[in-house]
From Swiss-Prot:
Its EC number is 6.1.1.11. This is Serine--tRNA ligase. Keywords: Aminoacyl-tRNA synthetase, ATP-binding, Cytoplasm, Ligase, Nucleotide-binding, Protein biosynthesis. It is an enzyme of class 6 (ligase). It holds the Pfam family tRNA-synt_2b. Catalyzes the attachment of serine to tRNA(Ser). Is also able to aminoacylate tRNA(Sec) with serine, to form the misacylated tRNA L-seryl-tRNA(Sec), which will be further converted into selenocysteinyl-tRNA(Sec). It comes from Thermotoga maritima (strain ATCC 43589 / DSM 3109 / JCM 10099 / NBRC 100826 / MSB8). Disulfide bonds: none annotated. Belongs to the class-II aminoacyl-tRNA synthetase family. Type-1 seryl-tRNA synthetase subfamily.
Amino acid sequence: MIDIKLIRQNPDFVKEALRKRGEDPAIIDEILKIDADWRATITKTNELRSRRNEISKNVARLKKEGKNAEAEALIEEGKRLGEEIKALEEKEKELQKKLNDLLLMIPNIPHESVPVGEDESQNVEVRRWGEPREFDFTPLAHWDLGPAWGLMDFSRASKLSGSRFTVMYGKLARLERALINFMLDVHTKEHGYTEVWVPHLVKRETITITGQLPKFEEELYLAERDDLFLIPTAEVPLAALHSGEILEEKELPKKYVSYTPCYRREAGSYGKDVRGMIRQHQFDKVELVWVTTPERSFEDLEELVKDAETILRKLELPYRVVSLCTGDLGFTSAKTYDIEVWLPSYNAYKEISSCSNVTDFQARRGNMRYRRRSDGKLEYVHTLNGSGIAVGRALVAILENYQQPDGSVRVPEVLVPYTGFEVIP
């Protein structure tokens, strides 16, 4: 949620930010209109309360003086004021809800360093690492390799759950588990993250804090009986962990890592990446979340990206880093880097991690603040998030980039201590 003061003081700046994102800026005028009405209602209510308090004092005085008729007249006026105040209080609540509902629909303001563009075609490549492998044979896609070994089963997954699910057996199931443990070990032992085990079901308030609600409810799985949402990413419980809290500056930054399955309806992705494991309703991910100060959050974002890159470098998978343009930014993000791994089946780089600074956007929704060391003043924290990395896509990248002419796949050296084997199948 962006600061209402920013909209009041600089509406043209906010409108321009929305235009850069490809959003309609008309909502800002609607917000300003409701905000003006809301503040005028508060002013009127306070004036009437003041008058009612004055009447109460005068009634007591008049009764002491024996002026009962005058006192009764004021009592009647006080009753009328009470009814007016009650009506204004109801109006104030309604206007505040309308205002809040509209504010929840406004995306974050892009940082000045974000390239301006309409869509992903205008994202800017920042760097590359490694070279795509040149095969001296025709490489197979992961959706051909896995089933050929009898270790990846899409048909039984469909029988169990429908489309966009996968069953894996034996060495592939162990490779998935090995990747999870490897990533957690790197981030906790080398990068200084605290591992957190989080709930996979969260309250509506929690997932509103992190920005998935109210705008993207159709993308989420909802357990209606208890009004709990399956998490689309561990970012949700991690970023909301300190909601309603005041942290001390000396505690920051906090660096959290969590492995969870992630659940997404992918309602808007019909027809995209329909084969294989690239776009699933359920997938594994290791997530990185920082809670930090405004002064250092963009510097911290660069470090978070490098932490995610380390995983791909250790796996020796070629990748590139791109800075998302304004038109491709996620709803909550002020700045995002995508890390894309090379997949031979697509002959292209595909996203395997998205790392974002959401500034104080989630902190305002969740009232997450810290006390400054210098003067004791309370300020909103900044939160960052990033995949460190998507496990299923890492498995896919290994299968496709490490395959051999005989149809087998060599396991990356760093994973062998975790798998206990060097070749699949």
